[in-house]
Regions:
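ANL superfamily adenylate-forming
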Residues: 2-37, 145-147
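Conserved AMP-binding A3 loop
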Residues: 41-65
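Conserved pre-ATP/AMP-binding loop-to-beta segment of ANL
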Residues: 26-45, 52, 75-81
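AMP-binding/adenylate-forming core of the ANL superfamily
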Residues: 222, 233-243
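Conserved AMP-binding/adenylation subdomain of ANL enzymes
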Residues: 64-81, 89-130, 140, 144-148
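Gly/Ser/Thr-rich phosphate-binding loop
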Residues: 128-133, 142-207, 220, 227-230
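Conserved S/T- and glycine-rich ATP-binding loop of Class I adenylate-forming
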Residues: 40, 46-49, 82, 88, ...
Length: 243
């Protein structure tokens, strides 16, 4: 949990968790690292676009820009508690669950390993206000809530909305979350190479089923042919992204 004075507070919601070991060097001053905006920050390995794993190198500017855009689009605040059930080595979890949350001074409620019951218990205990998850998580959580409707009361009025990516979320799952938890799940599009968020449905414009929404601030998108020439509106082609 980042706080405004630059320190970090850690809250543990799992009673059986082992205590954290003390860090004796916490008061030792460290020389600041000299980092340029375009210096590599992370290399995320992905096979999403080619089928074979490759490293996508993202700069500090890439990551910071995408995190700040997510804060603006989703309206994260320091009062939010973000569900941290996605792996943080994955672009979605790293940017939306962690980096954007830190940029907003929000809290991240971490879940070491996803199971529907453990996830729902964490959402209840930590009073999670924003869900960030992939469709399989939303599907399994909706199924559990349908079986145990008494647990839905904890989500109504606490969870503001959900964020979904990775693949399309079926319309019946959208409807189930709205009915069970009064929660709108917004879908978007991205890939590891783009830090990762390119576009998203946004509360300001409403959720359009079957759509990946509007392009994020600071991102430009064009549809071009195989020769790199821009295609007219309504024509198919390759999606070119920069930001």
């Amino acid at each position: 949990v980042p706080v405004k004075n630059g320190s970090v507070r850690c809250e543990i919601f799992e009673p059986s968790a082992s205590p954290l070991a003390p860090f004796d060097g916490v008061d030792v001053p460290l020389a600041p690292a000299v980092v340029k905006e375009q210096d590599p920050a992370v290399i995320l390995y992905t096979s999403g676009t080619t089928g074979r794993p490759k490293g996508a190198t993202l700069s500090h500017a890439n990551i910071l820009s995408n995190a700040r855009s997510c804060v603006k689009v989703f309206g994260f605040t320091a009062e939010d508690v973000i569900f941290g059930g996605l792996p943080l080595f994955h672009a979605f979890g790293q940017t939306v669950s962690m980096n954007a949350a830190f940029a907003a001074c929000a809290t991240v409620a971490l879940l070491p390993r996803f199971t529907p019951d453990h996830a729902l218990s964490l959402i209840e205990a930590a009073r999670v206000s924003v869900l960030a998850a992939v469709p399989s998580m939303y599907i399994s959580l909706a199924a559990l809530m349908a079986e145990q409707p008494e647990r839905c009361a904890h989500l109504r009025g606490t969870v503001r909305f959900g964020i979904s990516g990775g693949s399309a979320l079926p319309a019946p799952v959208h409807e189930a979350w709205k009915e069970l938890a009064d929660c709108t799940v917004y879908e978007g599009y991205g890939l590891s190479e783009t830090s990762p968020v390119v576009s998203f449905n946004q509360a300001a414009f409403g959720m359009v089923l079957g759509s990946v929404g509007r392009v994020l601030p600071g991102v430009q998108v064009q549809v071009r042919d195989s020769a790199g020439v821009e295609r007219p509106t309504g024509e198919s082609g390759q999606l070119w992204v920069r930001g």
